Amino acid sequence: MIELQNVYAWGIDGKDAGQFRNVFTDDVDAQYTTLMRMQGREQLSLWLETFHAPYDGTQHLFTNFAFTSDDDGVLMRSYVVANLFVHAYPGGENFVSHGYYLDRVVQAEDGWRVRSRQIINLWREGNVGLLDVGQQAVQNSR
């Protein structure tokens, strides 16, 4: 199951949508902020690809994995540090978000997949204006 986070991070940071989209079930339910919730692998994958595309670099680091099994699969909790970078961006080139992911992981025909995801942001540092770069890309794609 840890491999799911690794594949997700390498796919996002390598701008490889084909890689990270396979981490999720078809009916994934994902809440990336308190204001944004996406349902379905296609909607989530498109948003992730579009949001991260304009950055000169991103790096997602996962640690401190914890697992709890129940009848609905496995609850996987992991710390995340997500870095966004845009060269020569006004106000600062870097933004870093610290928090954790709460993932409901289920066994699918082709291996473990994330069925639900909630991101809990604990604190942020750097130029929060860099989030506008990804959000503007999403707005422009509509």
Which residue ranges define each predicted feature?
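Aromatic-acidic/polar surface patches that form glycan- and anion
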Residues: M1, D13, R37, D56, ...
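Short, low-complexity N-terminal intrinsically disordered segments enriched in polar/charged residues
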Residues: M1-W10, G14, G18, N22, ...
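Short, charged/polar micro-motifs that form catalytic or ligand-binding hotspots
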Residues: W10, T34, G91
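Short, flexible micro-motifs
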Residues: G14, Q43, L102
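A solvent-exposed, acidic/Ser-Thr-rich amphipathic alpha-helical stretch
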Residues: A17-A82
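A beta-strand edge to alpha-helix "cap/lid" segment located at domain peripheries
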Residues: A53-R142
